[in-house]
Amino acid sequence: MAVITKIEVQKRSKERFNIYIDKGQGEEYGFSVNEVILIKHGLQKGLEIDEIALGNILYNEEVQKAYLQAISYLSYQMRTKLEIEDFLRKKEVGQAIISEVVSKLLHDRYINDKEYAILYTRTQSNVNRKGPTVIKRELLNKGVQDLIITHSLQEYPKEKQIENALILIEKKKKSYQKHSFLQMKLKLDEMLVRKGYSRDVIQICLEELKDEKDDEKQREALHYHGNKYYEKYKKYDGWTFENKMKQALYRKGFSIDEIEIFLQMKREEG
């Protein structure tokens, strides 16, 4: 049995208190607690506490400490239930305490996976223009349940997906000016897949791109690559030269007809 002999406010934190006790051998430092725990257990000078009571006090102090750590972590941005659990595990908090903290956070509505999923979907679609497949995968990795994700993705209709994909295409295609139209389409297709768009949405967007095909830019790309390969393979003669040129330009996405026109032009120049 111990008796509380003194309670003093810590110098560095006005919300924490040092508790001094006497176990029959004079006053000594016992432990420190948060103000919440001080009030919860009615700690005051003269109070007698046994080992069981002390164990409860210290356990609740650990819960309160972990709770405040979680609140601080949440102050930067919203988090999912799993993210909070992982954060506390990294802080080497025990599972029993983690469960209590998460339960309290859920009760106090500091964490709500449904609200998180909806806001995350809106942000990733409107700001980062990610497709639904990537958004779903990221939410799953954050521990959000599949049913909640399905509900949140209703915030991202197909029309909006197409709009975002077309914006991404418009931005990215400028970097493919020296590619054949076919190769540009393939690269844009790969980009949209990485961004998380469905095959259906990609097909619709690339069909629109087909209508914008620029013959002049296609010729410029053909001449750019054709002249590069011409310098590379001009040391070869006849069939070998033409075969290497055709293979190289075909791999770049140019049609046989386009390649023949280019080679004919080179013959006439020669």
UniProtKB/Swiss-Prot annotation:
One of its GO terms (cellular component) is cytoplasm. It is found in: Cytoplasm. Keywords: Cytoplasm. GO terms for biological process: regulation of DNA repair. Pfam families: RecX_HTH1 (PF21982), RecX_HTH2 (PF02631), RecX_HTH3 (PF21981). Its main location: cytoplasm. InterPro entries: RecX_HTH_1st (IPR053926), RecX_HTH_2nd (IPR053924), RecX_HTH_3rd (IPR053925), Regulatory_RecX (IPR003783), WH-like_DNA-bd_sf (IPR036388). Modulates RecA activity. This is Regulatory protein RecX. The gene is recX.
